[in-house]
Amino acid sequence: MHDKLTANDIKKMQEELAAYDRKVEGFLKNREFDQAGICRAEQEKLIHKYEKACEANRKKQEKDELKVTENDIAEVVAAWTKIPVKKLTETESERLMKLESILHKRVIGQDAAVSAVSKAIRRGRVGLQDPEKPIGSFLFLGPTGVGKTELSKALAEAIFGSENALIRVDMSEYMEGHSVSKMIGSPPGYVGFEAGGQLSEKIRKNPYSVVLFDEIEKAHPDVFNVLLQVLDDGHITDSKGRKVSFKNTVLIMTSNAGAQRIIAPKNLGFGVAETEKQNYDRMKEGVMEEVRRLFKPEFINRIDEIMVFHPLTRVDMEKITTLLFHELSARCEKQLSIHLSASRALKEHLVEKYADYKMGARPLKRAVQQVVEDALAEELLSGRIKAGDTVSAGYRKGKVVFDVK
């Protein structure tokens, strides 16, 4: 009964008690002691009722009280410092020990690259590496569409908790000598001085990041001098004289150096059947020769790991197709409340017809969009598939079919 009393009810009781005080005082002044006693007894009952109501109200407030937990504090600190919550709440050793398995969920067919990156990251984080230098620096080479950028994204999510921790720098924007000012900021007196540098400002605001320098061979040689300082000293000084530290970053550079040799290799003499390993070794040798021609020795020597990615095999393509369908199924579940699955026949058809081993996984990704997603969109618009349905995508009689269960 008393639990249902509101704050207004309690306030009314306080007013009634004050009124009783005035009544008792009046009776005593007029020497009406009997009336004063009766009034005091009624007041005592109301006081008892009032105290019980206050106690019930206090207990209710304690029960409903908002409590600040460790996770709440972690969220606030993460918002202030840009350090991911994962890094604050999960022990780093746990993340580092399972780094390979985390990366393998997203990157297919690049065991050597994943292993090398994981080892280098572990070396950097346990304190064996210079604490002022970046956690790790890598140069990713190899054919297009084999997972160089995907590994960078997976690394950002695994180490720093989110793909948003990836800072992507397109090096084709730094082809001119004066474009160095875009990276670290314009000198005083020049246009854009107040804005700061594109790279230096991003790192200053997001110190825990994976920095991806895409197509690094396109950058002007003067830009490499800035990168040399980052790789060597772990910091740069921007145009305003502020020191920007890279010690909590992972630096990844990708290059298409030797791409033409990968797509159209030159074989002298008679054609000889090569094993997969021989083919990779020959490709790696050609790519590294091109790298030594394009980049200065002092730049190459400062990079922790140079990795030439393997071309994808049929088994890799099948795994990638499964991964693409898993992503599509997750999107359908989240956005449309549709449970989507794909038959083995459909996956095999896509790999058989659309897999291009020289162009990597991208043609396969386009095929899933054009063959499956377009057909699914038509089914949704026609009303044959609705929210909440369980749908199985298959391949029969030369076309994609959807069975609603």
Feature names for model-found ranges:
Residues 1-405:
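AAA+ P-loop NTPase nucleotide-binding core of proteostasis motors
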